[in-house]
Amino acid sequence: MLTRLSQIYSLKIELFISILLLSLFLFLQIVNSNAENVGADKTISSLNENQQVVTADDVHITITNNGSVERTGQKAIKNTDSETAGTILTIHSGSSVTSTAANTISTEGGEFEINNSGTISTNVSKAISLFDSDGVSITNNSGGIIKSDGNTILGSASTGADNTTIVNSGEIFSTETGDSSSAIILADSDTTTTGTNITNNSGGEIYNAGNDSTIVLGASSTLTNSGSIKNNKSVSNKAIQLKGNNNTVTLKDAGIVVGKIKAANGTTGNKLRFNHGVGRAYYYDISGDLTLEDLDGNQVVKGSAGSVGQGAVSYTHLTLPTSFLV
């Protein structure tokens, strides 16, 4: 009797495993059927719901004429692996790349250049995942939108993302109201991500709605702001966080920062420079070891970071939480 029961039990286990393997096979077939290999230059000018997988070097994908790549799942556009070089993605105004899951655009460790005048978005985290790449270039033009409901541009944790260049004249933002809500994170867990260069031009907006820092940098990186960088959750939250050493932040012209500017405890060589013009007054909420310098020769008042122009009054003791004062 026991032997018979054991045999029935074994048959049921084998049947279960067979059904499971068959289901997995069918799932992979469905996933693969919704993917297109891209081995040469390609233009998309209508709705395409298939994942675009770049399989060769020096491929240029152009999305134009209100065309879109709309992926149900993650990774709407990706390199096939870390050996893929020279990928260029251009998204024209009115066109878009979206996904319902994470990593809308994933570099997979390969080379990638993104020129966006349209929309890159996901309902969850990581509109752009830099995934251990080196030298990625992202240009977000005026009218361009890069957004997520989590960390929006990410090159962190174990993946890093050295020598990333971001030039923004549009909007880069996160709508997440809790944690994992940064607009840009380019710092891995031990702060060895280096060489980031972020320029936020006049009219450019980088902001978030949650508890985390709006922008997070690793080490030996630069951030130049002539637009706006805002932590919309609270002026007590960090707008700019420097996790490592030897970073340089330059705040220019009529640019504003809403939120704290913080260098992490124990870091060295971090610089905060002001270039708002002669006689212009400003006040920033800062913390950590930062070397302050006004490039226009205005006197910098430490405490937070304030400057007074000729004949102006000192703003050092005002309780203004942040921003630029004219």
Task: Place the predicted regions along the sequence by residue.
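Long, low-complexity, polar and repeat-rich extracellular regions
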Residues: 2-5, 10-318, 323
